[in-house]
Amino acid sequence: MKAWGFEYKSNLVWEKVRKDGLPDGRGVGFYFRNVTELLLFGIKGKNNRTLAPGRSQVNLLRAMKREHSRKPDEFVALIDACSTGPKLEMFARGDREGWDMWGNQADESYEPTWKTYANHTVATVKMSA
């Protein structure tokens, strides 16, 4: 983060769960079947204090997996409520109004291809038939 000019502030832990709410043990990992993923939260510039909702927000979110590398939309609402921005998602898939999106699939033409995960989020991106 520092190399990109950001100051690390905290992390958000995404606990990947199945439809029944139990841990999704299909994660990858050589030593463990990882059911969590860390999202790093950083800022640029001075006087970028977290908004009041962020000071009472726990850093754990339980949500179902989506297609490879795509984060749950639930994180967007959480970050929007806790930070004034501007906002950036690195290694993103798709685009999002009010955010800068960086990644080789970070544009409006991106569409999920894994129908398995079509119902796993509050996503606004529609799946093709």
Please give the residue ranges for each predicted region.
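Class I S-adenosyl-L-methionine
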Residues: 1-129
